[in-house]
Amino acid sequence: LRFCSPKNKDKGFTLDDINYWMPVDQYIGGVEHAILHLLYSRFFTKGISEFNKEINFREPFTNLFTQGMVCHETYKDIKGNWLYPSEIEKINGKKAIKKSDRSEIILGPPESMSKSKKNTIDPEEMIEKYGADAIRWFILSDSPPEKDIQWSDVGVVSANKFLQKIWNLNYMISERKEFSIDKKTEKLFISKMAVFINKIDSSINNFRFNVCIAQFYELYNYFKDFLDSKVSNEVLKENIVNVMKLMIPFVPHLAYECLELHKCNTLKSWPKIDKSKIFEKIKLAVQINGKTRDVLNVEKDLSEKEVNKIVSISSKAYKYLENVDILR
């Protein structure tokens, strides 16, 4: 409540201020906060609001989200002393020894990182080696944010390699030579991009960050497929810029570097979803002489001529249509 009236020297807060700013829209914190800070916050808010009916809220927080913990294996020497991961050396991935005297150590199960158990990673060392973006990407991609995650150096390396691919993709688009344009191919590309942006935007709003990152992996492959297609540089650049804006909450350093590569104003608004560009698709069963030979995903508004063309090049239906005319 005090944060709502920080400059008030006479009172802890004023009614106008707290009624304007409170309640907090979203509270994000670990489970341990639910039994300490949250409990006291609710207690004081309920107590104050009982004695002053002009306060127009009874709960301090509208929504609560509790994130999981980052976990790591624990290590003990034969005397029962806890050891840091940097003090041990793994052999064949099954057992480990103490670096200082080569004695065998006891491997413990993964537990939330703790100073007392020394199962922590030096963040400065990891950031120096891989960058903050790679670490953030790994943590967000490994599992749903409300679940605990198992720390993995291999996972961080993998995240770092993917982010390098994203940079290379942006560079290739910035240096790409213009292709002859096929409007239909371009239309399909724009439609698919609108679907991706819609999914990512929805997942961010629902705290499904791991789902977002899965979409980014799919987006990367999608862009790679269209690099050598008949899509204009303008359309490719416009959409890769939108993708990098979507990546800002996840990997801000890389995203801003890529946006500068495209000479884009990084302060522009969040990408907007043009739902008119999302083409509805239907499943079309291809029957030949009364038997289903294939099932195709096609746009709902295709003409009969366009459908026939798609069917004629279907790998499953082609052998039944060779040297024959399609009647209906």
Model-derived features: positions:
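NTP/phosphate- and nucleic-acid-binding module
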Residues: 11, 179, 284-328
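Short solvent-exposed loop/turn micro-motifs enriched in small/polar/acidic residues
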Residues: 62, 119, 277-279, 321-323
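Acidic, turn-prone loop/beta-hairpin segments
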Residues: 64-66, 70-89, 178-199, 214, ...
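Alpha-helix boundary/capping residues
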Residues: 7, 142, 262, 311-315
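Broad structural signal for hydrophobic residues in well-ordered alpha-helices, predominantly aliphatic
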Residues: 47-48, 126, 246-247, 258, ...
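Structured secondary-structure scaffolds
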Residues: 1-174, 189-224, 238-243
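Short secondary-structure junction motifs
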Residues: 56-59, 255, 324
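Short aromatic/hydrophobic-glycine micro-motifs
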Residues: 53, 132, 263-264, 316
